[in-house]
């Protein structure tokens, strides 16, 4: 996605794992800048990565929905909004991490806690508890 200049941050379960929460997750949740150009860059990046299901949608369809699911070899949930967090805040506070030599953008721990608390599902609240426990251990 970086090669296509997609403005995104990893959120959700994978972000929790990257911040030290021991849990399983089977999809990649990303929060994207909700502009038409950015949504098109996301589609282009997914197609270049071999996710053929990206061809089944348009930038306008992504923007018309809060969540667009791309399910191919992996499941990617592209979100244009998420409870408790704006894209601009997530982007301003993002953290760059590295996986196999590729940098990617991850939501900050504080923003992740805020978003998960706002989502309010039991799994999210458990992630908040574990994230805050890790803060206490490292702080």
What are these regions (language model features)?
Residues 1-139:
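Compositionally biased terminal segments of proteins
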